[in-house]
Amino acid sequence: MPLRVLKKRQKDLATWGKTEQAEFEQIMGVRGDKEIEHTYYICDMENTDTYHRPEVEKTSVYEFMKKSVDRMCYIMEQLHVDSNPVEVSQVDPCSNELGSVPDKRVYKYGNFVNRTFTNEYSAFVKRDATCICPPDKYKEQLEINIGYNFYSKKLMGADSKASTLCHEISHFYRVENKDEIWASEKNKKESRGPWGGVGTDDLPNDGDYKHAISEDGENIYIKYRKDLKESHSPDVFKNAYNFELYFELNDNECEITNK
């Protein structure tokens, strides 16, 4: 389901007519022709513990989204569920309040780690996983940790399994190999190679607001998402809660593009 959503948006960005542009601006609050800055990382895949340099790229919002969705599609195409589980660490890096659970074993099924014994989250990833894992190893090494809340979500639409997975994949850092060689600067600029995700964060990131409520009675993350959109802030492209809105499509909306 999430791959169908991403393919739909990939096609919309390839078409990019008046309808697609208007829908994009309505969802994100920012026009596609605006210029934004985007941070990515230069990584040394031969020495993954020693090299991690940030770079900043200026592009139009449209070019940023087009390349981002292409990379997200590649990641999603690699994700799979394997019926033969592999035991992984009990330690939960997303939730400090959760210690080891006595007699509890945690298993990974393909790329998905079953942590449904906790309702602290729907899902999470380690953002820097793409800094130490090249694209040809995504199928073997990338992990999506699944919490209990994920299973109560509908398949597609708002706050769904599909949009949640798009949210999580957007967290992975966009990376380039330290020794990458390009035929020309034009080739480098135009490349939409399958390296990492988008590098989004859960904003505001100065605290844990999973259960915090604003003065208006809304979850802090959701209120902040609305504020960014209404102020037409370019930070909507840094915030996974805003980013996932573009992927809140239902089944019929995805079918339309295949006619």
Which role fits each region the language model picked out?
Residues 1-162, 172-259:
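Predominantly extracellular/secreted Zn2+-dependent metalloproteases
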Residues 168:
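Walker B catalytic acidic pair
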